Amino acid sequence: MADPSNAALRSGLNNRYRVLEVRVVRGEGRDPEKHLAVSSDPSLGDTELCVLQNGWESVPVVPGDIVHLEGDCSSGTWVINEQSGYLILYPDLLLSGTTISSSIRCMRKAVLSERFRGSECGSRQTLVGTILHEIFQQSVTNNLSPEKVEELAKKIVYGQKYLKEMYHLKLKQTEIMQEIEEYLPSFFKWTEDFVRNPANQNKMQLKLPSENKTGDCSSTVEIVDILDIEENIWSPRFGLKGKIDVTARVKIHRQGGIQSRIMPLELKSGKESNSVEHRSQVILYTLLNLERRVDPEAGFLLYLKTGTMYPVTGTRMDRRELIKLRNQVAFYLMHSTYKSAVGRQQSQLAALPPLIDDSQACKYCSQIHNCFLYSRAVEERMASVSFPPALIPIIEKETQHLKPSHLEYFSLWYLMLTLEMQSGDSKKGYKNIWMIPSLEREKAGDCVGNMIRVDQVQEVSEGQYLHSFQRKNGAVPGANLLVGDRVVVSGEENGLLGLATGYVREISATKISCLLGRNLSKLPESTTFRLDHEEGDCSIGVPFENLSKLMKDSPVSEKLRNLIIDFHKPRFIQHLSSVLPPEAKEAVASILKGLNKPQKQAMKQVLLSRDYTLIVGMPGTGKTTTICALVRILSACGFSVLLTSFTHTAVDNILLKLAKFKVGFLRLGRAQKVHPDIRKFTEEEICRSKSIKSVTDLEELYNSQPVVATACMGINHPIFVQKQFDFCIVDEASQISQPICLGPLFCSKRFVLVGDHQQLPPLVQNSEARDLGMSESLFKRLEQNQNAVVQLTVQYRMNSKIMSLSNKLVYEGKLECGSEKVSNATANLPNLKMLKLEFADASKTWLKEVLEPDKPVCFLNTEKAGCRPSDIGIISPYRHQLKVITDLMARLKENRVEVNTIDKYQGRDKSIIIVSFVRNSNDENLGALLKDWRRLNVAITRAKHKLIMVGCVPSLRRYPPLEKLLCHLQSEAMIFNLPPGAHESIHKCNIL
């Protein structure tokens, strides 16, 4: 289950209670009740009682769960029953109305849809529905005439916005337009009936829950004003979220007078059914409205095909039952793992909600593959789980292509991903936006609060609005947000959560500009905003989806299962002549001239591969140059190449080199995340500059470039549905977890993984997941097939003294300098002579020695110096220390020196690097980061000419990797013992 131990508890409107005890109480002649002992006290000292009655006792709740309570509390007792109160289980888990309404027919599908989000793949019907929504929303907002609505429809269908989806589904714009036109008469009829001339409309029965009268409830409904479209509301009170299609001000005319309400209007483009699922969504939207306004008590359901509108009343009973359903979905999601009470304490996967006994419904379910896969891989072994007899042969047929080893791989990775996701929940997720004040989040570097909107909002492109925010008072904190960061914009006051999401476009000392998906100009000018760094679950579905895809019954998935799970030996072609076209030989020979021997060997190995090649790029060995040469050679031979990496920076570093050689490529991904010099190659910029507005033009663009580049998370792009590449090259492969690395491999015939498992591994927060093997990258897993491995050992970064550290620590002497010049290079310090005069007194003699260029490696032992972590540091293993160092550098008015973590420095270098090891002897716990020799290896291989390390030798000797390094430094006389007060002398002279 999820670990709620660090959940923030509180009383009040957004209260959070921990359940301490659960008792079922049965009285004579009375229905059973559940009595919960709960506490909102962080120390769990003060407890209250929550009594669940009249059906609420069926809510699954166990000790340790976090709940929100709505209703009245009298003398420390909450009573939640048929008439009053709500219990919300795990309220910080916001579930959509779609998820909850789908759970009515099948709870299992609702739970799986939250995990495997990409399985709800697009369809013609979905695309048409999305376009119809937009046409309707814009036409009612702007009160357009029928002629203008037809113009708008053509503009949207023949515009750029939906081209990718049409390409994905192999649809023509003319087909879509024909279908859209069938709906337009109903749009006009609805506008006539409810907006322009409501008095002529047939009366509808609408009784609001607050009305006591019985009898005739007939009324006419008039839409007075459209207040918002796609209004995004998060409700941490009810654990709900949703985008309301249309928020309208409505007048209800009846005999007794006129009532005014702000109500949700839900649009449906499919068959008119007035089904319980559709009605449930509207009822949930009435609950969402409570976050921002008076209870609307009802909403409307409009079927766009017919123009028929149904009133949907949000009765207490309906809301209550839907909240109970929501609680069940939340329980299964938050209790997806458990630890057995006896025996080994390893976490295990829990059962999903039971399978429904309806093979016809299962047949058309989008989650059928994942549902049956989980049944076979996980639940089949559970004594407590039984399957409907009619489904057993269907489950076996759906999964018969999978071996036991494949099912084991699936269940292990599903468990590890779930553990990691639960571990990340406390540190990430959206809940900190409503549970932690902006000032507190700001201090932690995750938010900028107290902002007001300035300047006019500009619509930069369809659905993209440029907003400028300025601090209400004071300067904008510098390091909290960076250009390209995803942000969630909320109002500082309660109820205005998650107004819009988008990206930081520009930052200055006084202003932050963001590109948002919604226009916030309708909000009052006095609204104060907070901009939170989005670390939410936008990418959570990708690894689960890739894992699911690996288990599919398809040729590409079968090949990858054989290679990755069953370790089939990679195959190679015997002769280079059979893959090298005669017309490419001259170009290939020319490219090879600029490479060293190991790099040439790598080129040959890749060309001869039928399955995969691993290139070990040791520090400074020209990994980017090698990949660039490889892409040029493959391109010259007529092969198509998918180039990918975990980070946008790594992709762009290769593309910057490729651009110099005039190799054509297409860069996928948001322009904001791409290097400025590469933006002209992005799909976004090309579509804009070439005015691409047809599916044919888009297809031509995709087919015109043999090289396509994207980050690993970008493989859900439509191009990959239709295009198979000859080669896929994955840079930083040793840093990418297996399920994420799988994504691009589905799109290629052969793949090349480039990395070095002696450097940073995939980042895993959960210690149990790490122990189970989650930090093993695909690169490391496949490295056992040594015939597929090529090592790059000639390095051009470090001088020989710096290189010797890594050779001793990790590489067993394999690294060698590329030339004498590299071997003997020292730091260029033109002002050193002048500085030496400043260091004349005895307290600074150590500084003279340390700065000598002919001493390339120095370890400054701070044992006696009393040097605090905040005094020195450029690379640090700890993010918290970075803020301290950055602030110090700002006070020194020095902004040219880059301060970053080890992880951020991977793949990069500088002439001089200072590494600050921040632990001292007072620290009780050994830092996990300092125990990791791979991180240490990265830290000591970033400097070209001078490496200065700062730390307390006795404290650091407790870490095995550092003990080994310190022994080598001691034997080479590279450790300098600083005198007491050494740090004070630094402040007195201007070194920077």
UniProtKB/Swiss-Prot annotation:
Q: Where is this region: Helicase activity?
A: 489-992
Major place of residence: nucleus
Q: Which cofactor does this sequence's record say it needs?
A: [4Fe-4S] cluster
Q: Which domain of life is it from?
A: Eukaryota
Presence of keyword Nuclease? yes
Catalytic activity reads: ATP + H2O = ADP + phosphate + H(+)
Gene3D superfamilies assigned = 3.90.320.10, P-loop containing nucleotide triphosphate hydrolases (3.40.50.300)
Keywords (alphabetical) are:
4Fe-4S, ATP-binding, DNA damage, DNA repair, DNA replication, DNA-binding, Endonuclease, Helicase, Hydrolase, Iron, Iron-sulfur, Metal-binding, Mitochondrion, Multifunctional enzyme, Nuclease, Nucleotide-binding, Nucleus
GO cellular component terms listed in the entry, alphabetical order? cytoplasm; mitochondrion; nucleus
EC annotation?
A: 3.1.-.-, 3.6.4.12
- PANTHER family associated with the record: DNA REPLICATION ATP-DEPENDENT HELICASE_NUCLEASE DNA2, DNA2/NAM7 HELICASE FAMILY
Protein name (Swiss-Prot/TrEMBL): DNA replication ATP-dependent helicase/nuclease DNA2
